[in-house]
Amino acid sequence: MGLDVLTIPIQLTQAWFYLHYAELTGYELNLERDVAGRPLDETKTYIYDINEKGLRPAEQGDINANHIKLLRVLATRSIQTIAQIGGVEKILPEVWLVARQHAAI
């Protein structure tokens, strides 16, 4: 299920794939700590740091707690489970971009 189900947004399937691909190649995205090693804070916003391959706090960041929650679900759940989650379309473009940048594809 995923690529053959037209009701699942292609960006959702791709983001799921990118995160799992990065994990399989040994570069799992840290969704618990920022690039400085501090725990992620739900009140802060972040940007993806391509050089450090992680999230960096930034006042003008476009990644917030909701994006991080979806990234965590993508990294730990099956595409069948994720497809049942509603309301992700609003944050999916940013999540897709982070996953794609992290996988370096």
Question: Residue spans of the language-model regions?
Answer:
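Non-catalytic alpha-helical scaffolds and adjoining flexible linkers that form interface surfaces
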Residues: 1-105
